[in-house]
């Protein structure tokens, strides 16, 4: 153990502690070097400050010189100085945890790295690179490194806490940003890249997962483990192995194994496309096929893509890295910031502006449909119970405990309302015996029974399931449980399930379009028959029976 620790201390000397300065701007930090000598190594000599940050003892006979000694340096932070809370994220060799400093009550995102794992997986260069790059950055659109410390087993990086998490979470939640939101967040990313490239740094893994949002919903770019600091005479960096993420990797990295500042501009083009369309431009079943599409520039714009945003993306997704808008060969960031897409942007104080409310945009898919806008602002913090009428709620899906009159006889056909061969819904006032008969009938003749785990289907029908600007036909199956399954009707494959919880809430937008809100995502669905309100009504009915008639189910 001693040798392992010594190796890491030699390879990853944590010598600098970044501390807050008394500047009015929260983005300002000051780097304080503790010592020019390596930190103490167990079993070795200790000529510099101790690792706990206390000053070294004065040498005997040096009393006459004590007045010339520098003041003692601040005590190095230790794990016991913090109360550690929830896990914010996990990487291949690190965990990020929310922590509150006991002395100041300040919150930090502390990145904890296991020394043994770093050495075993040869990740020492990633750790040192991330620390070195972050110590160079002083800009409001980047996560800040405030301090570093270590114990015998772990390294700790104290980072600014981006309270609202990843940009990707919001893309998945609302599907497609409206033009105002797309413009604002693209402008912040451009401003950040201009600063980063001005420092001679290439990020090399820019993607929505690595763009966080702080408490005020401004961006904070993070994850510099694969970043590269260019030497003054170099314009590009060689990559001996693949770095980055498949959907956002630039063609020059695939063909020449080199990355340049313009590689980040390619990733910017992919991100803009994803903000508008809801999905990245290059998509396929595996990484090899994605790479083939990238090097052939094979991608399409969906209908209703904002025209000015499309023009900008086309000027960024260019195979020749020297022809991308914003690169040095194209006169830098001036022409990029002057693009018509940004004509209403005030660049000077973006970090002080109030971000627009996140608003989903669902353009009409045909001339007969309407555009839909979904204001996501209230959904950020409010997912209370649906306030719906509890009239005639039953304790189960059977009629035995309800106040509703039971229908006479055992003719189960009276409960089934067929709309067409692939659409029907059930009345819910059936007995347990009738439910058994309905389930037998379903198992024997309904081709969708195989997808619902032997649950009774209460309503089903084809819908167009929207994800951003893309739509796919699905068979939607509302069942007991409750469950909301959706199936590919052509390939007969179960594609997924809308997660049920007490916070689930249906919302009809017009005759065809309805939303199903869940805490982590809003599902956008369109009923081609124009009966969106019937889906919402049936979902509400099942929701009431699940949560208002079974209060204990809400905490399960």
Curated annotation (Swiss-Prot):
It is an enzyme of class 2 (transferase). Induction: Stimulated by insulin, and the oxidants hydrogen peroxide and peroxovanadate. Residues 82-342 form the Protein kinase domain. Pfam families: PH_3 (PF14593), Pkinase (PF00069). Residues 459-550 form the PH domain. The gene is PDPK1. This is 3-phosphoinositide-dependent protein kinase 1. InterPro entries: Kinase-like_dom_sf, PDK1-typ_PH, PDPK1, PH-like_dom_sf, Prot_kinase_dom, Protein_kinase_ATP_BS, Ser/Thr_kinase_AS, Ser_Thr_kinase_AGC. The active site is at 205 (proton acceptor). It is found in: Cytoplasm; Nucleus; Cell membrane; Cell junction, Focal adhesion. Its main location: cytoplasm. GO terms for molecular function: 3-phosphoinositide-dependent protein kinase activity; ATP binding; phospholipase activator activity; phospholipase binding; protein serine kinase activity; protein serine/threonine kinase activity. Homodimer in its autoinhibited state. Active as monomer. Interacts with NPRL2, PPARG, PAK1, PTK2B, GRB14, PKN1 (via C-terminus), STRAP and IKKB. The Tyr-9 phosphorylated form interacts with SRC, RASA1 and CRK (via their SH2 domains). Interacts with SGK3 in a phosphorylation-dependent manner. The tyrosine-phosphorylated form interacts with PTPN6. The Ser-241 phosphorylated form interacts with YWHAH and YWHAQ. Binds INSR in response to insulin. Interacts (via PH domain) with SMAD3, SMAD4 and SMAD7. The lineage of its organism: Eukaryota, Metazoa, Chordata, Craniata, Vertebrata. Its EC number is 2.7.11.1. ATP binds at residues 92-94, 111, 160-162, 166, 209, 223. Residues 113-157 are annotated as: PIF-pocket.
């Amino acid at each position: 153990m001693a040798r392992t620790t010594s190796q890491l201390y030699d390879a990853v000397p944590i010598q600098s502690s970044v501390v807050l300065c008394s500047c009015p701007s929260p983005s300002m930090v000051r780097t304080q070097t503790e010592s020019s000598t390596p930190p103490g190594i167990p079993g070795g000599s200790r000529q510099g400050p101790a690792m706990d940050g206390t000053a070294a003892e004065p040498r005997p006979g040096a009393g006459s010189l004590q007045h010339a000694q520098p003041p003692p340096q601040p005590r190095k932070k230790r794990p016991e100085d913090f109360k550690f809370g929830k896990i914010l994220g996990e990487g291949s060799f690190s965990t990020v945890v929310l922590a509150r400093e006991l002395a100041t009550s300040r919150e930090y995102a502390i990145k904890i790295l296991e020394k043994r794992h770093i050495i075993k997986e040869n990740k020492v260069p990633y750790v040192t690179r991330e620390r070195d790059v972050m110590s160079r950055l002083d800009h409001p659109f980047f996560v800040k490194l405030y301090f570093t410390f270590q114990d015998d087993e772990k390294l700790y990086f104290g980072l600014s806490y981006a309270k609202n998490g990843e940009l990707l979470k919001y893309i998945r939640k609302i599907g497609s940003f409206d033009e105002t939101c797309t413009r604002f967040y693209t402008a912040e990313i451009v401003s950040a890249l201009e600063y980063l490239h001005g420092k001679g740094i290439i990020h090399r893994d820019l993607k929505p997962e690595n763009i966080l949002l702080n408490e005020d919903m401004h961006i904070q770019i993070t994850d510099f483990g694969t970043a590269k600091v260019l030497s003054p005479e170099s314009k590009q960096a060689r990559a001996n192995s693949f770095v980055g993420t498949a959907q956002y990797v630039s063609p020059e990295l695939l063909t020449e194994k080199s990355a340049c500042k313009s590689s980040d501009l390619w990733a910017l083009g992919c991100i803009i496309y994803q903000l508008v369309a809801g999905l990245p431009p290059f998509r396929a079943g595996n990484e090899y096929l994605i790479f083939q599409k990238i090097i052939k520039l094979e991608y399409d714009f969906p209908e209703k893509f904002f025209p000015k945003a499309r023009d900008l993306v086309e000027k960024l997704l260019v195979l020749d890295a020297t022809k991308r808008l914003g690169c040095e060969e194209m006169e830098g960031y001036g022409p990029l910031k002057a693009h018509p897409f940004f004509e209403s942007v005030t660049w000077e104080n973006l970090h002080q502006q109030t971000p627009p409310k996140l608003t989903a945009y669902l353009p009409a898919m045909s001339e007969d449909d309407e555009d839909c806008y979904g204001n996501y602002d209230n959904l950020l913090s409010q997912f209370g119970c649906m306030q719906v009428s509890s009239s005639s709620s039953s304790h189960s899906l059977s009629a035995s405990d309800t106040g509703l009159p039971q229908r006479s006889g055992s003719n189960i056909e009276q409960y089934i309302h067929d709309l067409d061969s692939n659409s029907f819904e059930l009345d819910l006032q059936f007995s347990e015996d009738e439910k058994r008969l309905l389930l037998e009938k379903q198992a024997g003749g309904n081709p969708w029974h195989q997808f619902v785990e032997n649950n009774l289907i209460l309503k089903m029908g084809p819908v167009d399931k929207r994800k951003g600007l893309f739509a796919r036909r699905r068979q939607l199956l509302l069942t007991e449980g409750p469950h909301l399954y959706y199936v590919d009707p052509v390939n007969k494959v179960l594609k997924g399930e809308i997660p049920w919880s007490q916070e689930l809430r249906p919302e009809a937008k017009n005759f065809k379009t309805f939303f199903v809100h869940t805490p982590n995502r809003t599902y956008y669905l369109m009923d081609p028959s124009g009966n969106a309100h019937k889906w919402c009504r049936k979902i509400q009915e099942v929701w009431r029976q699940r949560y208002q008639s079974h209060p204990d189910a809400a905490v399960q």
